[in-house]
Every structure is written in C-alpha cells, then in structure tokens.
Amino acid sequence: MNKSKIQKFAVDGHKLLYKQIAQRAYQYGIEEENVGKADATEVRGRILSPLEKSQRAALIAEINANGYQQTIERVTYIWFNRIVALRFMEVNNYLPSHIRVFSDASGAFKPEILNDVLHLEMEGLDKAQIAEYIENNNTEELYRYLLLTQCAELKAALPDIFVFGARDRDYTELLFPNNSLS
C-alpha cells in the first residue's frame, strides 16, 4: 500500500474541507476578523431560522472562547473524521440502514441514499421535510439533511465520532460544507 498517496489525499482533503467550513462560517457572517453579533436574526440579507440562530450563537461563543482558527480547525477535524467513518461503514456495509451515503453499489459517486429516500427508515427522519425538499427539487439540501440525520442516528453507536450536542447547540452541523454533491 502506498502510504504517501494516502497521506497526500488526507492532507489535501483536510485543506479543502477547512476552506469549505470557513466559507460556510462566512455565509453566517462569521469571519476571523469579525464574528458578528451572537443575537443576529439576519445575516448577509438572509433571515436565520431559530435553529440557525441558536447554532450560530453557540459557534460565536466557541470562537470567543477559543479563537476563530482553532474553532474552524476543530470543526474540520470533526467533519473529516465523520466523513471517513461514514465511508468506512458504507463500504463495509455497517450502516444501520444498509444504504450507502456517498456512492452506489458500483462505487460511483451517486449516493444510494438519494435514490432510496422514500423507503428510508432512520431515527429522527422527518418525512414531511423530505417531501418538501423533493417538491422544491432541492437535491443538495435533501442530501445534506439525510447525511446529518445519518450522523445523528450513529451517535448512539459511535458517540466519540458522531457526538452531537443538543441539536440546537451543535454548531458543527451549521458548518457542514455546501455543495457536498459536487
């Protein structure tokens, strides 16, 4: 096995993920030089949902306590570990649903979870939310929702990797990168 290729992949993947997470923080009005007000109800012209407001406030509190770079780096490591664990579980058929999150059975990046969404049984899955995403043809948000729900379901089995705080306080969920289907 060529370990240098794996190391390069991990380093490059980490750098890309860090940039994507920092971009996501930026979308919520959080920058290294200015984290903004924790009680904001609107950011960059977009009104925040109650869940987003709570998660954003928790993120700002974490940044104020530990610094911007350290917080973004921590979230990057958390998501990197979650993605690697999900992929490992997917390839080895360890996921409780036995439905792949990142690929299809042939290994192509065509998430089975999107194809089997109407038959999916997962703890915490909101069928009405799924129907709304499908109705609005919002595949990216549907995929994001399914991936986050899969992570939340796995926290009982693997709390060290998939630990989420109270759902409204877990800012790592807020920072999961956009365009995860790209």
What residue ranges belong to the model's regions?
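Charged, often flexible domain-edge or linker segments that flank or initiate folded functional domains
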Residues: M1-S182
